[in-house]
Structures are given as C-alpha cells and as structure tokens.
Amino acid sequence: MQEKIIILDFGSQTTQLIGRRVRELDTYCEIVPYNKFPKEDPTIKGVILSGSPFSVYDKDAFKVDLSEIRGKYPILGICYGAQFMAYTNNGKVEPAGTREYGRAHLTSFCKDNVLFKGVRENTQVWMSHGDTITAIPDNFKKIASTDKVDIAAYQVEGEKVWGVQFHPEVFHSEDGTQILRNFVVDVCGCKQDWSPASFIESTVAELKAQLGDDKVVLGLSGGVDSSVAAVLLNRAIGKNLTCIFVDHGMLRKNEFKNVMNDYECLGLNVIGVDASEKFFAELAGVTEPERKRKIIGKGFIDVFDVEAHKIKDVKWLAQGTIYPDCIESLSITGTVIKSHHNVGGLPEKMHLKLCEPLRLLFKDEVRRVGRELGMPEHLITRHPFPGPGLAVRILGDITREKVRILQDADDIYIQGLRDWGLYDQVWQAGVILLPVQSVGVMGDERTYERAVALRAVTSTDAMTADWAHLPYEFLGKISNDIINKVKGVNRVTYDISSKPPATIEWE
C-alpha cells in the first residue's frame, strides 16, 4: 500500500502548496479538512498542520483534538498549526504589533536539530501572520529565531513534534523544501517511491478491477487533463473506452482537426462532433458573459448526451478531474460547496457511474504522467484554455466573423510565442477581441476597425498570476503581424493586469 503524509487543512491559502511540495519529494500526501483525520490507516507516516486565516483566539477558529495523533505520528505545525499546538499546551500566543508579512531571515537556529539539517545560515523564510508565539511550555524547546520573532520554531522535547512560525512551502522560503524533506524523509521515514511510473502501474490495475468489461465514455476537451485521462484509460480497458470531442465552433484555429489527429495517433477511439451550427444559433445576440457560459455548458451536455446514447451499454462516465478540483469541492467542514465535475450535470442526467483516474494528481503531476505515457510534448504542455473557448474572449455577442478574426489573431500570437521560445515561459496566453473600433491609417486610407488585446500571464496554479513581461521586440512584431495579416484589426494592445485584482480571462 502507498505510504502517505496527511495534511490537515485549517483553511490556509497555501495548503495546496504544502501538498505540491510534499509530492515534489516523490512522496504521496492527502489534504483533508482539519476535523476529518483518517483513523486506523496503517499507511500514514506523518501529519502536517496547515496555516489558517483565523487567530487561535477567534470564536470561530478551527480547533481539533490532537491527542489521538500526537505520540502516534510525527507532527509538523506550520504558522497557525504551530500556534495552535503551543496555545493548547498552555503556551502564549499574542497579537503582533503589526502583521508580519513577507521576507525574514533565521538569525539563529539549532543546526543539530534534524529539521534544520542542510539549512544555510541566515536563510530567508516567508512570514504571514498576525499573531506571534511569545512563550512556550516547559517541555517545548525553541530551535529558531528571526530578527523580529523570538520563537520562530520549536520542538517538543522527547517527541517528534515541531512547529514553525514561517511558511516553508512558499517559494520565497529559500530552504523550505529542505526543511520539508527533513521532516518527510528523515523524520517520517517516507521512501520517496511516489512516481509517475508507480502511479500508472497502480492506477491501471485499479481501473481494470473497477471497470472490468464495462464500457466507458469520456468527453475530451483537447486539454492536458482529459487527454492524459483518456490515454491512461485506454491502456487499462482499450476498445471499451469511447471518447467524444465536441466542436462548438469556438476552438482555436484548426484546433479540431489538429487535436483529432493527435488523438488518433495515440490510438484512441474518438468520435468528433461538429456542433458549431447549434452553438452559434443559440448564442446569437447574447452578450452577458455568464449567460454565454451557461448556453455553451448546456449545449455541450445536450450534444454529449445524444452521442453517448448512440453507444450501447455504457456504464461509466470518465472525466479528467484533478486533485485541486476535489479539494475545492469541499468546504473546510467537509460539506460540498460546488460540484467538481468537469461537465456539470452529466452523471445525473445520464445515470452513469463516475470514473476519475486523475483525481489524486496535481496539474504538474498530470504532465509528468503524460510524459511517462509517451504522449507528445505539445499536447502535454498546452496552456489552459477555457471550456467555452473563444466565446469568453470575444467581449459582446458572438458571430462567425468575430470568431474568424480572433482565431487568426490568436494563431499569430501563439505561434509567435513558440517561435521566440516564450510559450513554455508563460502559464497562459491568448488574444481578446474588444467591443470597440478605432481610427487608423493604412496606406493613404483612413480605417475604422477592431482592436484586440494580447494577454499573457505567469503563474504556478492560476490562483494568482502576474502579467508576463514579454520582450518589446516580440510584442512589436506580433502587433505588426496581426495588423497586417488579420483583416478587420487595426490596433493591438497588451494587458498588464495581474490577478488579483483582475482575472486571467476577461469574461
């Protein structure tokens, strides 16, 4: 059985980042609500307590009885997790004079403590807290300080229990990964045997046992998640998998043909459906973004349902749901707050059982599995693309002419990113067709044509994103190419908004 680290989530914005850092150590972990610790699980090797937006003094602060965990498993408390353990053992936690947020340095630490093995002197750590541990119980030992925080880390004497006031999971903590490695590998004894190859081997075996000779249908989007799910299922059940790829008319230029060719080269049984007439008719005159999304979502369900019913004896619906979707579908108390299904409503409407072979993976792990499966790199590294496609990059109503303009402009931009070696440096990129026209001059004639905005962002998880600082020379060439080659466009702008406050997509 796969050994694991359990991360108890107290509501921190960086809880998923803890999970990703542990997985990067080739160690399997699971994130569970703070009050849902899985008892009697022999595969658990250690426990990490996350941070929290609460103070330990808040009436609604998340609290849990750790008596059944402490002494049985090694524990690492991060920020609120460290404060909570100190506070519940008669230590003192007090509001800081000012909230400490940002870089700090460990001015002193116990070099002989296993948690700090290999950590450099004066190493930078990331702080984000309003409360500070000001006193610890007699059996707690201070093991690190910063210039502003006296008790930056502690260990319970004689126990494998640590607390750190800083966030080792955050990129800005320079030796954060080393600290987590020390806990996960040296303290908990994890074997670091979680790999794409081991995941594929175990998942294929599980899928064969789960699905048997049943038939499965899967909706493909052209994105990495559904594509990797399809290849994995194909390895497990072969001809019993049927994939459906619906073209709603708002894909990127030549995308339907190119993606279908990719899928056929991968040996997948794929049904391609051109439903563009239906979608354009239903979207005619619609300008409100959310209504556009709902029309496309419902239309996809209708088309998919019709095609799936043409396949006899289908028992399962497969989806490319990944681990962050599953985590986000639960509130901190474990109650459902939104469906994580990639295609909302399909399982209920079609009365099919649900199969989600990637539900344990983060996005970067999905790509690693795709490479292990031998999938082409251009498919694995594709940027995220919204389900409604270019419909949410056309501000205002949707027409075939607007889609044509946007497809041509987007094709020039994306190909340019590839040609300049910039594509893999950005998280997501695309062109937005603006609902305005501007005056221009071409030759000796005055023009009054459309404006487009280029968008490119850098990110690690899409929760936050910064605008990509692309070279001016590149932007100038792309602007010139679009204006000269795309009929109907005479102005190109570049969006330099970050998330937050803006979102990655405009609609």
From Swiss-Prot:
InterPro entries given in the database record: Class_I_gatase-like (IPR029062), GATASE (IPR017926), GMP_synth_C (IPR001674), GMP_synth_GATase (IPR004739), GMP_synthase (IPR022955), GMPS_ATP_PPase_dom (IPR025777), NAD/GMP_synthase (IPR022310), Rossmann-like_a/b/a_fold (IPR014729)
Active site location: C79, H167, E169
Coiled-coil residue windows: none
Annotated positions binding ATP: S221, G222, G223, V224, D225, S226, S227
An annotated Gene Ontology molecular function: GMP synthase activity
Domain named GMPS ATP-PPase: residues: 194-382
Gene3D superfamilies attached to this UniProt entry: 3.30.300.10, 3.40.50.880, HUPs
EC identifiers of the protein: 6.3.5.2
UniProt keyword terms in alphabetical order: ATP-binding, Glutamine amidotransferase, GMP biosynthesis, Ligase, Nucleotide-binding, Purine biosynthesis
Xref: PROSITE patterns: GATASE_TYPE_1 (PS51273), GMPS_ATP_PPASE (PS51553)
Record's keyword annotation contains Manganese: no
Entry-linked Pfam families: GATase, GMP_synt_C, NAD_synthase
GO terms classed as biological process: GMP biosynthetic process
Top EC class of this enzyme: ligase
Pathway connected to this protein: Purine metabolism; GMP biosynthesis; GMP from XMP (L-Gln route): step 1/1
Glutamine amidotransferase type-1 domain segment(s): 4-193
Reaction catalysed by this enzyme: XMP + L-glutamine + ATP + H2O = GMP + L-glutamate + AMP + diphosphate + 2 H(+)
Subunit composition and interactions: Homodimer.
Functional note: Catalyzes the synthesis of GMP from XMP.
HAMAP family: GMP_synthase
Name recorded for this polypeptide: GMP synthase [glutamine-hydrolyzing] 1
Organism: Bacteroides thetaiotaomicron (strain ATCC 29148 / DSM 2079 / JCM 5827 / CCUG 10774 / NCTC 10582 / VPI-5482 / E50)
